[in-house]
């Protein structure tokens, strides 16, 4: 099928002067044959694995290149974007001038011109009223496969008159030799022009640049329309009650949002508008390091024909060693969302959220297993995006390493973080949603809070049992905590009781509180941020 809607004028606007052959929206069988073609070499060629999935390598680019991300600073973005050279908060939105943009676009256009091109037209966003119609152009079959997996696949009828709102030109094979003179970070680039509606990719083969690039675009467009744009997972219960799960890596977001009694809306990127919560994507992009059928059966079973593995170690017999992280700890698999059985069908959207859960894995042992949050506290902890991991020192002593990521996804924010907190709070208020902080980390006993206890806590939140529980106030952080919950050992609900003395907890709490206070200072460059300071910990 060839789209008649791709006009010569559009190709010119992309900077592409012609092509040898156009492969438009190929099916999975064709992509499978294309990407394992023995005539291919290097990073273009995939390897067939025993599961039926194809595995590809992306070279040194096993993750995003945050220092190589640029956005054209023009009349549209100058006063709206959260720039890396403005304000107190560090981010990846490095400004790019128009002249350099034109140069980069010519580089990518030259690379793609005269080639055999794959074009994938897809939707970003399950809600028709706000979805983005996106066109991906690449000369690499598996990159076409990746975006076919990850985004929402239009029907044949929808493809007939497809007019893109945004275009992604993936020129992974080209680089920018003039980067030094232009004041850029390296020869590689991931550049956005929000006025033209184009993303350029050069030098990096990492598939996630296309996925997260579109998330950054949605993060710019939707909040300006009053629609929440969120880095979270979402599911819905039998009573159509929707829950959102925010959390950084290692907090249990995927594990806790995967529930046999609840249908999955999506695992990573969502919007929330007047109709409810909706998935941006049509697929999943899961980590595979140390993957096992026992620990994560849904993901393991999703790795089959049409799934695409990235940077895994494939043995000579075609089996995959998921425990081998020699290429990267960020090994991934993309697959269509219908590879998961218990999902919302036919469209990945549901009603308004009634429960918003912020997950943290506190290695300091200070935060409670669960706390109910006021609307102001919800915004504060959303902006903080806190978790902590245990890391070894050179002497072998285990010490907590804190991580703060605004809105649980600072790398993908296009506007000031307070804009996302404001829109989320308005959506929560209109829906009567309640927010909770859930700590999946450690307490004073030195042990991690058990998955059994955490699941029981999550169930108490989803069933509203926690709302009727007796409560107390935890000092320093001023959190409302339950003193009893059915099925949970009451001794762990107040973290102070897990220490030999309350003074020991207090010393650690004061230390962690100061880290929160120091981090939150970067949001006080706006009145909205200043207004939320009192909702955080106080020393």
UniProtKB/Swiss-Prot annotation:
Keywords: ATP-binding, Cytoplasm, Decarboxylase, Gluconeogenesis, Lyase, Manganese, Metal-binding, Nucleotide-binding
SUPFAM superfamilies: PEP carboxykinase N-terminal domain, PEP carboxykinase-like
Binding residues for ATP: 212, 231, 247-255, 296, 332, 448-449, 454
Entry binding sites for Mn(2+): 212, 231, 268
Reactions listed under catalytic activity: oxaloacetate + ATP = phosphoenolpyruvate + ADP + CO2
Role, per record: Involved in the gluconeogenesis. Catalyzes the conversion of oxaloacetate (OAA) to phosphoenolpyruvate (PEP) through direct phosphoryl transfer between the nucleoside triphosphate and OAA.
Descriptive protein name: Phosphoenolpyruvate carboxykinase (ATP)
Species this protein is from: Sodalis glossinidius (strain morsitans)
Lineage of the species this protein comes from: Bacteria, Pseudomonadati, Pseudomonadota, Gammaproteobacteria, Enterobacterales
């Amino acid at each position: 099928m060839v789209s008649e809607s791709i006009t010569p004028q559009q190709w010119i606007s992309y900077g592409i002067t012609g092509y040898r052959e156009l492969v438009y929206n190929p099916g999975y069988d064709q992509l499978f044959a294309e990407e394992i073609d023995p005539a291919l070499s290097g990073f273009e060629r995939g390897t067939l694995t025993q599961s039926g999935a194809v595995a590809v390598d992306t070279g040194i680019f096993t993750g995003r290149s945050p220092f190589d991300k640029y956005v054209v600073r023009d009349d549209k973005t100058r006063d709206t974007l959260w720039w890396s050279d403005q304000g107190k908060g560090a981010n990846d939105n490095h400004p790019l001038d128009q002249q350099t943009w034109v140069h980069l676009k010519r580089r990518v256009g030259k690379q793609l011109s005269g080639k055999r091109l794959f074009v994938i037209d897809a939707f970003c966003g399950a809600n028709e009223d706000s979805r983005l119609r996106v066109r991906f152009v690449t000369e690499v079959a598996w990159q076409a496969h990746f975006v076919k997996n990850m985004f929402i696949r239009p029907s044949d009828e929808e493809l007939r008159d497809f007019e893109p709102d945004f275009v992604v030109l993936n020129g992974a094979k080209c680089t920018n030799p003039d980067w030094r003179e232009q004041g850029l970070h390296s020869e590689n680039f991931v550049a956005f022009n929000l006025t033209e509606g184009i993303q350029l990719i050069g030098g990096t083969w990492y598939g996630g640049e296309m996925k997260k690039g579109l998330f950054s675009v949605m993060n710019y467009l939707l909040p300006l329309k009053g629609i929440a744009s969120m880095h979270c997972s979402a599911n819905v219960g039998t009573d159509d009650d929707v829950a959102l799960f925010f959390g950084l890596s290692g907090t249990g977001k995927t594990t806790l949002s995967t529930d046999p009694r609840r249908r999955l809306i999506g695992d990573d990127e969502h919007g929330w508008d007047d109709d409810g919560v909706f998935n941006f994507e049509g697929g999943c992009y899961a980590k595979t390091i140390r993957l096992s059928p026992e620990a994560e059966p849904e993901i393991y079973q999703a790795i089959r024909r049409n799934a695409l593995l990235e940077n895994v170690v494939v043995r000579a017999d075609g089996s995959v060693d998921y425990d081998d992280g020699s290429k990267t700890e960020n090994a991934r698999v993309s697959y269509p969302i219908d590879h998961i059985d218990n999902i919302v069908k036919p469209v990945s959207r549901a009603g308004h959220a009634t429960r918003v859960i912020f997950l943290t894995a506190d290695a300091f042992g200070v935060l409670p297993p669960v706390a109910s949050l006021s609307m102001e506290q919800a915004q504060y902890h959303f902006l903080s995006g806190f978790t902590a991991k245990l890391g070894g020192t050179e002497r072998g002593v285990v010490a907590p390493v804190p991580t703060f990521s605004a809105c649980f996804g600072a790398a993908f924010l296009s506007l000031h973080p307070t804009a996302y907190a404001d829109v989320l709070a308005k959506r929560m208020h209109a829906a009567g949603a309640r927010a909770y902080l859930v700590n999946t980390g450690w307490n004073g006993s030195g042990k991690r809070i058990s998955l059994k206890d955490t699941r029981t806590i999550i169930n108490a939140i989803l069933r509203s049992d926690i709302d009727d529980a007796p409560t107390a106030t935890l000092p320093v952080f001023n959190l409302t905590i339950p003193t009893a919950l059915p099925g949970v050992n009451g001794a762990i609900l107040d973290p102070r009781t897990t220490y030999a003395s309350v003074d020991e907890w207090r010393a650690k709490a004061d230390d962690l509180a100061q880290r929160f206070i120091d981090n939150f200072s970067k949001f006080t460059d706006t009145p909205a941020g200043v207004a939320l300071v009192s909702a955080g910990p106080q020393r």
